[in-house]
């Protein structure tokens, strides 16, 4: 006869002894005083929640900070509706110059253990700490835009509407003529103009090496100059 206890019925159906088992089937029936019967399982409504009324992203971080629980750095990147909801926390992100990130996917939000939050948007950085939660609006942008790399400068040059329209040395028009390329982004009307440009660059490089040799006292071989 099955026990009236639901836990006893579940355990009796979960464990089935083998055909050659030496253990009596009686041992597979839980008693009324089984430790599982004495355990108190929490109800779904009693678990502690950190959603702060349905919030996500930094809402969880704020709840953890209030409960004095240490956290590791948390990073949120804009990704549509599944990303960090800046519209919900618009009061905490009052950017200068009217920047609205609520609909943007080009930002990254990072929160560190000490409570400092940084928001990276394009080439700008905004950061704030705990004091800003109380109304302080001090923002700072420590990121400085670095100089453009040579590769980026060459890309900009290729995108220029005047690209390969005139010789880079004598400025003659190149339309309808053979173009002699140098470094992939400089066009010349003749081999002579291109050779002069190569010589000019070689002399500049030699001057740099000579300056280094004077400063360090080391002998550095000068590059050869080859005319094409």
From Swiss-Prot:
Induction: Down-regulated by glucose and sucrose but up-regulated by mannose.
Claim: Membrane is one of the keywords in the record: no
Keywords for this protein: Metal-binding, Zinc, Zinc-finger
Single GO biological process annotation from the record: response to sucrose
Cited function: May act as an adapter to facilitate the interaction of SnRK1 complex with effector proteins, conferring tissue- and stimulus-type specific differences in the SnRK1 regulation pathway.
Assembly and binders: Interacts with KIN10 and KIN11 via its FLZ-type zinc finger domain. Interacts with KINB1 and KINB2 via its N-terminal part. Forms homodimer and heterodimer with FLZ2 and FLZ10 in vitro.
The name this protein goes by in its record: FCS-Like Zinc finger 12
Source organism of this protein record: Arabidopsis thaliana (Mouse-ear cress)
Organism phylogeny: Eukaryota, Viridiplantae, Streptophyta, Embryophyta, Tracheophyta
């Amino acid at each position: 006869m099955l026990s009236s206890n639901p836990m006893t019925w579940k355990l009796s159906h979960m464990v089935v002894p083998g055909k050659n088992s030496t253990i009596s089937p009686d041992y597979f029936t839980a008693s009324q005083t089984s430790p599982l019967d004495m355990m108190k399982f929490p109800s779904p409504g009693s678990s502690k929640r950190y959603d702060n009324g349905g919030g996500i992203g930094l809402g969880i971080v704020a709840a953890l900070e209030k409960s004095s629980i240490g956290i590791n750095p948390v990073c949120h990147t804009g990704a549509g509706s599944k990303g960090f909801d800046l519209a919900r926390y618009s009061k905490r992100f009052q950017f200068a110059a009217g920047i609205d990130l609520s609909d943007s996917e080009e930002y990254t939000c990072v929160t560190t253990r000490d409570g400092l939050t940084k928001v990276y948007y394009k080439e700008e950085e905004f950061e704030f700490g705990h004091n800003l939660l109380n109304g302080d609006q001090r923002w700072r942008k420590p990121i400085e835009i670095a100089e453009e790399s040579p590769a980026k400068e060459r890309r900009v040059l290729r995108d220029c509407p005047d690209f390969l329209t005139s010789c880079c040395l004598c400025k003659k028009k190149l339309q309808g003529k053979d173009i002699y390329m140098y470094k992939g982004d400089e066009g010349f009307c003749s081999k002579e103009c291109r050779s002069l440009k190569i010589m000019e660059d070689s002399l500049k490089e030699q001057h740099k090496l000579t300056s280094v040799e004077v400063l360090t006292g080391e002998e550095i071989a000068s590059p050869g100059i080859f005319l094409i």
